UniProtKB/Swiss-Prot annotation:
Residues annotated as transmembrane: 82-102, 121-141, 177-199, 211-231
Topology relative to the membrane: Multi-pass membrane protein
Species lineage: Eukaryota, Rhodophyta, Bangiophyceae, Galdieriales, Galdieriaceae
Entry keywords, A to Z: ATP synthesis, CF(0), Chloroplast, Hydrogen ion transport, Ion transport, Membrane, Plastid, Thylakoid, Transmembrane, Transmembrane helix, Transport
HAMAP family in alphabetical order: ATP_synth_a_bact
PROSITE patterns xrefs: ATPASE_A
Gene: atpI
Protein name per UniProt: ATP synthase subunit a, chloroplastic
Length: 233
């Protein structure tokens, strides 16, 4: 066995003008976006005062997202952030489930293989950076330049620690989501090779549960950071 001949981290790229794009992430991300758009169109196509079927399900999802946002941000600001928190939650949720349910690895690519977008550190880092920009925007739009006074509270001695905290938030968000989804897919792949008929199903169910929890944690923390930024001390 020639261990040195094994190539790690192969990716499939395509070029768009001067840009080199990560095709594996883009393909599955567009699939996830199409799924979300399709559900939205079908659920709101023939809306009625008495919701049923898909409309009823979508209204339940919206209420769930509103509850998350309201509990972390509070009145009266939470309504402005429901679309952002909802977009984060739904994209991560559907991405995670697509990685657990759809056999992406059966699709042959020139290089690399398809997987959930959240299985790529670039995706989770981008989502975490968007969250950071969101809570900076929330704080500055609410307080103006007074927002930056929080770095010297309760004492200026804590200035380095408070600055470091803004760097650790996106790091923890991105690596937590990436690590959990990557580990789940690796476990399912290995067990499928070892015991293809018995073990993978319960492990897959556990993976779906863990994937849902990770989407909830990410959305809740994003809302909590925004609520912290606009909170008056």
């Amino acid at each position: 066995m020639l261990i040195s001949s094994v190539k790690v981290g192969e990716h499939f790229y395509f070029t768009l003008g001067v840009f080199k794009l990560h095709a594996q992430v883009f393909i599955v991300s567009f699939f996830v976006i199409l799924i979300l758009i399709l559900f939205s169109v079908l659920g709101t196509n023939k809306m009625s005062q008495t919701p049923r079927g898909l409309q009823n399900f979508l209204e339940y999802v919206l209420e769930f997202i509103q509850d998350i946002t309201k509990s972390q941000i509070g009145e009266p600001h939470y309504r402005d952030w429901v679309p952002f928190i909802g977009t984060l939650f739904l994209f991560i949720f559907v991405s995670n489930w697509s990685g657990a349910l759809i056999p992406w690895k059966m699709i042959i690519l020139p290089e690399g293989e398809l997987s959930a977008p959240t299985n790529d550190i670039n995706t989770t880092a981008a989502l975490a950076l968007l969250t950071s920009l969101a809570y900076f925007y929330a704080g500055i739009s609410k307080k103006g330049l007074r927002y930056f006074s929080r770095y010297i509270k309760p004492t200026p001695i804590l200035l380095p620690i408070n600055i470091l905290e803004d760097f650790t938030k996106p790091l923890s968000l991105s690596f937590r989501l990436f690590g959990n989804i990557l580990a789940d897919e690796l476990v399912v792949s290995v067990l499928t090779l070892l015991v293809p008929l018995i073990v993978p199903l319960p492990v897959m169910m556990l993976g779906l549960f863990a994937s849902s929890i990770q989407a909830l944690i990410f959305a809740t923390l994003a809302a909590a950071y925004i609520g912290e930024a606009i909170e008056e001390h």
